């Protein structure tokens, strides 16, 4: 949380690995997926947005990505747009801000509704990575 406290979620991402933030748009009441990645220096990028219809606050940014149709979804793919560290105000249960990573789903709305959280990344040494493979951070989801 931005206001302090223990992290809600710790993901040991490898460079290029992706995680998804999934939620229900509060105005359109439609599902949204935002796919993010991490580069070797620890910068966060948004790679793709997927939704049923353009809604309030959604849509293509000129020169960023490519709009395609994938089944029932509008998808902006190949974005690779740097977000860096960012703050998300977690929505209520029903909005269900959920982080999807390596087959796990962590519903942040169930843990901390209406709380501002910071998504941030820091490169770690191979030794730290090896240590956390044996002894995962308490906020890392079990796979």
Regions found by a protein language model. Give the residues of each.
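N-terminal secretory signal peptides
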Residues: 1-53, 57
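Mature, soluble, non-transmembrane domains
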Residues: 44, 58-143
């Amino acid at each position: 949380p931005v206001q302090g406290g223990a992290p809600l979620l710790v993901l040991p991402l490898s460079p290029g690995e992706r995680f998804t933030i999934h939620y229900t748009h509060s105005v359109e009441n439609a599902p949204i997926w935002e796919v993010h990645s991490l580069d070797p220096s620890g910068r966060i990028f948004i790679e793709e947005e997927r939704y049923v219809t353009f809604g309030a606050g959604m849509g293509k940014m000129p020169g960023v990505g490519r709009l395609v149709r994938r089944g029932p979804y509008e998808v902006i793919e190949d974005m690779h747009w740097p977000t860096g560290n960012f703050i998300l105000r977690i929505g209520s249960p029903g909005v269900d801000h959920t982080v999807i990573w390596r087959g796990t789903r962590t519903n942040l709305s169930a843990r901390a509704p209406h709380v501002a959280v910071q998504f941030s990344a820091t490169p770690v040494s191979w030794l730290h990575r090896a240590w956390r493979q044996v002894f995962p951070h308490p906020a890392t989801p079990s796979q």
